[in-house]
Every structure is written in structure tokens, then in C-alpha cells.
């Protein structure tokens, strides 16, 4: 993806440099995330979805944009609002829905539910119901990449509540001091 000069307040033709098919794909992906969360939310309100459910409606662009810049070998960690991150990283919509309904065909065989999604095959290291818990996981994975000499990065999605957790400051400090391949969003 092209890099934008932070001092340039105008997009300066950046959007014109991206292929239209790529941009349409991003829009399609954002729509998939929005519609899937809205529909499962409607079903949850009718009592059809077991367990807790945390939706990410309105957060689609961050997930899709970040994951569009990743390579298949790159990894992500997520929050309790993980559905969009899972799908944006390449997770199967069928596996996600099966997981939310507690079915064996789910990405965690129906045991993880909405807040505990994992799919190592696509580099989705996990979502977590504990505020800020993805931060040290992302740093540990990035440290593993560094130690093994592997060329992949970790993107760590987190919410504003994580800023008040000790793990937030510890993780950012460790990542900076050791110059680890991790991006915090």
C-alpha cells in the first residue's frame, strides 16, 4: 500500500493510485462485516444465539483496512469484539457463525463463542474477553518471530479500556525497547 506523508492534509491523489477493484473489495469486505454483525445481533435479540455476544458494528473500516495491508503469514490478536477482525483476516463466515451458535463446525468447535475465537491457520492468534489481554499475547508472538528469525508482523487490536491496564504500558514499552514487529491499533 502507498504510504501517506503525515504533513499532507490532502490525499494528493493517493486514492487514484489504488486499483479500483482493490477499493471495491475493501468496500465489499466492510459490508460483509457490517451485515453479518447486524444479522447475528438481530438473532441474538430474539434469543436465538447462545451465550454473550459483542458486536463490532461501526468498526469495520479499521479491521478491513489493517488486514488488507497484511500478508498471509502475518498475525493478529483481537478483543472481545472480534467478529470483524476474524473475517477481515480471512476467517470463514460459516465457521464464525457456527462458532457463535455453539456448533462443532465452528472455528473453535463451538466451545469459544463470540469472545474467544482462534484460527491459527489464518494467523488469528485469538480474541479475549479480558480487557487488554491481547497486548501481551501480540508482544509474545512478535518476540517469537524475532527469536526464530521469521519475517512476519503482529497487529494487535485493542479498545480504549485497555489503556488503563498495566499490560498496555508493559506491552508497548517492551515492544519499543526490543523493536519488535508489532503494530498496536
What residues fall within each predicted segment?
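Short intrinsically disordered, low-complexity coil segments enriched in acidic
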Residues: 1-2, 179
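Conserved acidic/glycine
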Residues: 2-62
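Cofactor-binding active-site loop characterized by glycine-rich and histidine/acidic residues
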Residues: 38-42, 46-178
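A short, conserved beta-to-alpha structural element at the edge of catalytic cores
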Residues: 178-185
Amino acid at each position: 500500500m502507498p504510504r501517506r506523508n503525515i504533513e499532507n492534509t490532502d490525499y494528493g491523489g493517493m486514492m487514484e493510485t489504488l486499483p479500483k477493484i482493490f477499493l471495491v473489495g475493501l468496500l465489499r469486505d466492510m459490508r460483509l462485516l457490517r451485515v453479518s454483525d447486524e444479522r447475528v445481533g438481530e438473532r441474538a435479540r430474539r434469543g436465538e444465539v447462545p451465550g454473550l455476544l459483542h458486536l463490532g458494528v461501526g468498526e469495520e473500516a479499521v479491521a478491513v483496512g489493517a488486514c488488507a495491508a497484511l500478508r498471509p503469514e502475518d498475525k493478529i490478536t483481537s478483543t472481545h469484539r472480534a467478529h470483524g477482525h476474524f473475517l477481515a483476516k480471512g476467517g470463514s463466515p460459516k465457521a464464525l457463525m457456527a462458532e457463535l451458535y455453539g456448533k462443532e463446525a465452528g472455528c473453535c468447535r463451538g466451545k469459544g463463542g463470540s469472545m474467544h475465537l482462534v484460527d491459527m491457520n489464518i494467523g488469528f492468534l485469538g480474541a479475549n474477553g479480558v480487557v487488554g489481554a491481547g497486548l501481551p499475547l501480540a508482544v509474545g508472538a512478535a518476540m517469537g518471530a524475532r527469536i526464530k528469525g521469521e519475517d512476519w508482523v503482529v497487529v494487535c487490536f485493542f479498545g480504549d479500556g485497555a489503556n488503563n491496564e498495566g499490560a498496555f504500558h508493559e506491552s508497548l514499552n517492551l515492544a519499543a525497547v526490543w523493536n519488535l514487529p508489532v503494530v498496536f491499533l
